[in-house]
Structures are given as C-alpha cells and as structure tokens.
C-alpha cells in the first residue's frame, strides 16, 4: 500500500483542503436568488393591508425645512406600466400612505396648484382636484399618514397603456409655536397599494419615485 493510499485511508470520511476549496468554488458559481429589498422596520399599525401592497423606501429619509416659516411642499409621483388583455382603467385602484415625521404637530393640507415645467398640471395632465380629498391619520410611531385613492377615467381601455400619477402635498405650519425655529419634517417611506380585478388579467408594474429637491421648488408660495 502506497503512502498516499495509507494517508487517504487514515483520514477516511474527512474532506481534504483541496475538496473543500473545490466545494466552495462550486458553491460560489451557483446562481444566487434575487435579493429582496426589505425595509428594516415595517409599520405594524398601518391602515393598509399587507396583501397587495408594495413598500417603497427612499433609503435615507429626506429632510425638508421651511425657509419662510409657512410650510414646505414636495411632489411624489409614480408611473404605472401595465400590460394585459383589455385592461380597464376603472378596474385599477391605487392607495398611498405617506409616513411623515414633522418637527411638531402642524396642519397638513393638499395642494392643487402644482404644475410641471412646461406648465401642464400634473396627475393625468388634468387638475389635481381630480384626486379625492386625502384623509390624514395620526400614527404614533410614524408621524402622520395620508391615505387616498387615485381615480381613473371610466371608459378608457387599451391593451397596453402608461400613465403617470402625481400627488402634491403641503405641510402647513399654521400651528407653529411662537418663538420656535423654522419647522421641518422627515419624509420616511411610502406604502403603495395596487389592486386590479380578475378580469384585468396578468399585470406587470413599475413604480418610480420622484421628489422635488430644490429649495425654490419646496417653498410654499
């Protein structure tokens, strides 16, 4: 019996360093499952159901400050990109929940005068008042939540269609305590609920986040 055979027999059942390296290399070459972007903390008392919702996190919370002491404004928009047989827009229901942490309990309000760079009103190219009034709810852990359902135009149907929705929000500081510093708040995360009735068929979606980040755009006029 050769020395190599004795060595192999003496260490039967024990992997060699070479075999361990080979196994590690083989494991590294295996296809990895897609990484899931799961937020560190999810709200437990949100008014939206878990099913059918997409948790859209902006990563680092966005902090905005008021330069005139009145309030600040931002624009949140998302694009829906669906493909399916004879999708009816009225079959699609959207909800959003904004998690906002203000520096103190101010008054929230919706704005209806936000326009795009070329002067067109946002939200389907129509005035913002097409959106029903949002309902704000206090959230002890996450500040405040705005919930609304984005309406769609009845009768429109296409096999493939793309529409962009946008919501303009204003944080009003009418209740600012006397002598306090310029108010600010942190824009944390957004819940987006997407629903479609069964007849809409299989759907694919793309959600993008757009925020106004220029101080001039955020000032309330």
Swiss-Prot record:
* The keyword Acetylation is annotated on this UniProt entry: yes
Q: What keywords are annotated for this sequence in UniProt?
A: Acetylation, Capsid protein, Ribonucleoprotein, RNA-binding, T=3 icosahedral capsid protein, Viral nucleoprotein, Virion
Keyword tRNA-binding included in the entry's annotation: no
- Identify the GO cellular component terms for this protein: ribonucleoprotein complex; T=3 icosahedral viral capsid; viral nucleocapsid
Residues with N-acetylserine modification: 2
* Domain of life according to the entry: Viruses
Name the major location. virion
Task: Note the Pfam families from the entry.
Answer: Ilar_coat
Show the segment(s) annotated as Disordered: 1-24
Location(s), subcellular: Virion
Looking up InterPro entries in the UniProt record yields: Coat_Ilarvirus
What are this entry's molecular-function GO terms?
RNA binding
Q: What does this protein do?
A: Capsid protein. Binds to the to the 3' end of the nonpolyadenylated viral RNA and is involved in viral RNA translation initiation. Probably binds RNA and plays a role in packaging.
The UniProt similarity line reads: Belongs to the alphamovirus/ilarvirus capsid protein family.
Q: What name does UniProt use for this protein?
A: Capsid protein
